[in-house]
Each structure stands twice: as C-alpha cells, then as structure tokens.
Amino acid sequence: MQSIAKLRAARISAQKARLVADQIRGKHVNDAVEILTFSQKKAAAIILKVLNSAIANAENNEGADIDELHVAEIQVGEGMTMKRFRARAKGRGNRICKRTSNIFVRVQER
C-alpha cells in the first residue's frame, strides 16, 4: 500500500527544502517525524505537515498500518518565482525573486 501527498508553491526555496528532505528519505515514518519535529529549519515544519498528510491518507484511504510505513520517495522541485521590485538609489530598481517549491511525499508499507 502506498499513499502520496503534495504541496505546491510552498514559500521556501527548493535548495533549502532539499537539505531537510535528504535527511528523511528512506527512513521509517516514526523516525522521520521525530527528525522533523526537532529540526530548527523552516523547511522541516513545512515538510512535516506534508508527511503527516501522507500518513493520514495511507491510514484513512488505504487502511495501512502506521507502524509499517516508511518514506519511499520525497521530491522537492522548484515552483513558481514571484518577482518583486525594490527601489534603489537614483531612481533605479532591483528585482527581488521570492522562490517557491513543490513538495511531493510518497509513503509505502515495507
């Protein structure tokens, strides 16, 4: 049994979110939740919500046993980039890129 959860346009850059995703890839679900709970990174809280959603999907939709689940796949890709303007000296302006990411989590029974 496998179950997925997706989050699109999360307000964190994909590069920063991948650092956290690499820590839980292939781990047992309980271990992954523990790692994310005690991590100080902003991405950990976002990925924890997606992981909990995938666990709930597996339990409610598939009838899976939570103790048998592990993180089979986690992907973090670049989402859309919001372009903003910052005023600079002498009437100039610079572009600010606010990056987003798409997070995909698949949990599966071993």
From Swiss-Prot:
| RNA-binding among keywords | yes
Q: Which GO terms describe its molecular function?
A: rRNA binding; structural constituent of ribosome
Keyword terms: Ribonucleoprotein, Ribosomal protein, RNA-binding, rRNA-binding
GO BP terms: namely: translation
Q: Which superkingdom is the protein from? A: Bacteria
Its GO CC terms? cytosolic large ribosomal subunit
Known partners and oligomeric status: Part of the 50S ribosomal subunit.
This chain's function reads: This protein binds specifically to 23S rRNA; its binding is stimulated by other ribosomal proteins, e.g. L4, L17, and L20. It is important during the early stages of 50S assembly. It makes multiple contacts with different domains of the 23S rRNA in the assembled 50S subunit and ribosome. The globular domain of the protein is located near the polypeptide exit tunnel on the outside of the subunit, while an extended beta-hairpin is found that lines the wall of the exit tunnel in the center of the 70S ribosome.
User: What family is this protein classified in?
Assistant: Belongs to the universal ribosomal protein uL22 family.
Which named protein is this? Large ribosomal subunit protein uL22
Native species: Dichelobacter nodosus (strain VCS1703A)
